[in-house]
């Protein structure tokens, strides 16, 4: 809703219709480290956010390719995209906090969002499945101020209606 409404308002009225969620003057926290999260970082900065923090549950990727990740495989490296670059230019630091998730949203006496409680995460092996998973680090909870929280996580993929309309088989 945040990105779509901002784009529609920008195209329809150069943001003069106020038909979007404004980040102006707000302490913005974005949950999600992917492309949509990056777009939320950049858009929040252009709105005039007081601060922008981006939470990523996974560890920071390495700065250079590992030997087991050769070309032409997709590079599994840390990517600093335009939104993070804008945050560095405006606020003087990378907005990302890695291996962190939200445990609780905090509200003031009027019921308005005023912050959240985060917790650090670490990789652990699930004893039942043998798979690696992220688990909370006990005692690592921290409070963070926030006036606006944007959830930018869980991309499910594209819609199939165009492929279906043309009889294209997907795999």
For the regions a protein language model found, what residue spans apply to each?
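Residues forming the flavin
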Residues: 1-171
